[in-house]
Amino acid sequence: MGIKQLFSVIKDEAPDAIKEGEIKNQFGRKVAIDASMSIYSFLIAVRSDGQQLMNEAGETTSHLMGMFYRTLRMVDNGIKPLYVFDGAPPKLKSGELAKRFQRKQEATEGLEEAKETGTAEDVEKFSRRTVRVTREHNAECQKLLKLMGIPYIVAPTEAEAQCAVLARAGKVYAAASEDMDTLCFNAPILLRHLTFSEQRKEPIQEIHLEKVLEGLGMERKQFIDLCILLGCDYLDPIPKVGPSTALKLIREHGTLEKVVEWMKADPKGRYQIPEDWPFEDARTLFFEPDVRPADDPLCDFKWDKPDIEGLIQFLVHEKGFSEDRVRSAGTKLEKNMKTSQQARIEGFFKILPKTEEEKKAHKRKLEEQAEQKRKKVKEEKKEKAKLKAKPRGA
C-alpha cells in the first residue's frame, strides 16, 4: 500500500523535509486522518494467540477499542481530529485490490496450518495478513465518532486524496496517514504514526512536501513520475527497478514518457515493462482525484459535545466495554474538547500566498537543482566508464 521505498528516498535525498517530535507538539492543530488506514492498524494489533480483541458474543472490538482510545489520546494532547473514510476505489486500483484479496486467501490457509503446526510468531504473522477492513467496521467506527462528537466524512474515492484537499485549503494543519502516496495527492504536510499506541514509542513524523521537492530538485509532475516508477497501488511495478534506479532514471530522462521510451529502446533489454501499464492514467489519478472540494457543505466540520449516555449504551451494553472506563473517558473527553478550543499562536497569523514572482523564482531554483543533479549523474557515469576501460593493475 502506498509508494514503495518513498520514505527511504526522502530520508536520503531530502532529510530536512522530515521532522520528528512528540504528539504534544501538535497541540491546538486540526488534523485530517485517513480512517481506513487507522482502522486497519487497530485490527492488525492482534494478541499473542493470533486473535483480535472480542466481546463475550464473539464480535471483534479491536477497531472500536483502537478508535476510542487513540482518539482520546489525541484530544488529550490538544489535537482536533477529523476522520476521512475511503469511498469506492478508482477502477485502476481494481488489479491491486484483487491481488490483496488473493494474498489474504493464501494467508487464511497459512494461518490454519500455523495454528496446527507453527510457532506463535507464525500465527501472528499470518493473522495480520488475513485482516481487512469491512463495511461493518467502518459503520461501527462512524457511529462511535458521532457519539464522541468527532467529525468525519466519507470521500468519493481515496481518503488520502480528500485529506490532502482539506490540508491544502487550510481546513486542517496536516493529513495523517501511514500511506506515503498522500504526498502524491499534494498534501502540504503529512503526519505519520499519529494513531500509533503510546507503548510503541514511535515519534510523530512530519513530512513537508515543499522541502521534499526542494531536496529532490523536482517539480510535482516529476515527483509523481518518480513515485509511479517506485511502485504505487495503481500499477504493477517494473521488475529490477528499485529506489536508486528509479531516481537515476527520472533525473536522467526528466519524464516517465522518456524513461519508458528509453527502456523499450534499450539494446540490453534490462527492463520488462508490464503489458498493461497505463502510467498516464495513474498520473491523472494523482493530479485529478475524485474528491469533494474544500468549500463543499460536507467539509464544514464541527466538533460537538460527546453523548456520554450514548457511548455507554453502544460500548458497554452492546459491545461489552467496562462502564467505569467508558464513563471516565467520556467525562475526560468532554473536558478536553473544551480546552482544545485554544488556538496555537501561528493560528493568529495569516500566511500570505506566494506572489507570481516568488513562484517563478522557486521554479527556477528547482530547475537549477535538477540540472546540477543531472550533471552529477552524468559525471558519475563517465567516471564508471573510465574505471571499466582502465586495464587491470594499471
Swiss-Prot record:
Pfam families per the UniProt record, alphabetical: XPG_I, XPG_N
GO biological process: base-excision repair; DNA replication, removal of RNA primer
UniProt xrefs under PROSITE patterns: XPG_1, XPG_2
Enzyme type, top EC level: hydrolase
Chain residue ranges for the region called I-domain: 122-253
Molecular-function GO terms, alphabetical: 5'-3' exonuclease activity; 5'-flap endonuclease activity; DNA binding; magnesium ion binding
Residues binding Mg(2+) 1, per UniProt: 34, 86, 158, 160
Gene Ontology cellular component annotations, sorted alphabetically: cytoplasm; mitochondrion; nucleolus; nucleoplasm; nucleus
Binding site for Mg(2+) 2: 179, 181, 233
Ranges for region N-domain: 1-104
Region (Interaction with PCNA): 341-349
Positions with biased composition (Basic residues): 384-394
Reported function: Structure-specific nuclease with 5'-flap endonuclease and 5'-3' exonuclease activities involved in DNA replication and repair. During DNA replication, cleaves the 5'-overhanging flap structure that is generated by displacement synthesis when DNA polymerase encounters the 5'-end of a downstream Okazaki fragment. It enters the flap from the 5'-end and then tracks to cleave the flap base, leaving a nick for ligation. Also involved in the long patch base excision repair (LP-BER) pathway, by cleaving within the apurinic/apyrimidinic (AP) site-terminated flap.
Stated name of the protein: Flap endonuclease 1
The organism of origin for this protein: Neurospora crassa (strain ATCC 24698 / 74-OR23-1A / CBS 708.71 / DSM 1257 / FGSC 987)
